[in-house]
Regions:
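An acidic- and aromatic-residue-enriched active-site/binding cleft used to recognize and process polar
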Residues: 18, 26, 56-60, 115
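Internal mixed-charge
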Residues: 2-3, 7-11, 88-165
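Short secondary-structure subsegments characteristic of cysteine-rich extracellular domains
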Residues: 26-45, 148-164
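Generic macromolecular interface patches on structured domains
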Residues: 19-22, 51, 144
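Divalent metal-cofactor coordination and adjacent catalytic microenvironments
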Residues: 32-98, 122-138, 142
Length: 165
């Protein structure tokens, strides 16, 4: 069965021993918690590992407004960029806000993690990590238990380590 935001939420709720939901808009504590946190949890998992399905390459044009001092060029991140993974330049570069500043000439080639919202692109390991991250993020709201929350954090950390293997 294909994953949905509801099925991922229900996996997180099951880990917490809570009742499943039928929709993120259900008028229940569980649905409200999942609805409030699922996008933040998803983006945190995306940032936590260079997932193949979320990795993109792009050549950035220099911004028309140069940095005030030190560096000669600024390059704005793509709008769907969550994390810069690689910048293809021998020049020094730094991230400032949502820009890369450097003396590198345009175009600046980068590899980055994109914000993927199409759930059909998620791989199974990502779905498991996402459910664990969501469980950790909603654990205290659902269970009022610090130990349960800490356990979900630990399980999430282990799942992310598994992804790195």
């Amino acid at each position: 069965m294909a994953s949905t935001f509801v099925s991922i939420s229900n996996r997180a709720l099951t880990l917490l021993g809570a009742q499943p939901i039928t929709s993120l808009s259900d008028d229940t504590k569980e649905a409200r918690s999942c609805n409030r946190m699922h996008e933040q949890s998803r983006d945190q998992v995306l940032r936590g590992h260079p997932w193949n399905f979320a990795t993109k390459r792009v050549a950035l044009a220099a911004n028309t407004i140069a940095p005030v001092w030190y560096y000669t060029n600024a390059f704005d991140w793509p709008s769907d960029c969550l994390r810069i993974l690689q910048v293809d330049t021998v020049e020094e570069w730094v991230v400032e806000g949502r820009s890369i500043v450097s003396d590198a000439a345009a175009p600046l080639n980068i590899v980055y993690t994109s914000q993927v919202t199409d759930i059909t692109l998620f791989d199974t390991l990502f779905v498991e990590a996402y459910a664990l991250r969501l469980a950790a993020d909603i654990a205290y709201d659902i269970t009022a238990s610090q130990p349960v929350m800490a356990n979900m954090e630990e399980l999430y950390t282990r799942k992310l380590a598994e992804a790195r293997m």
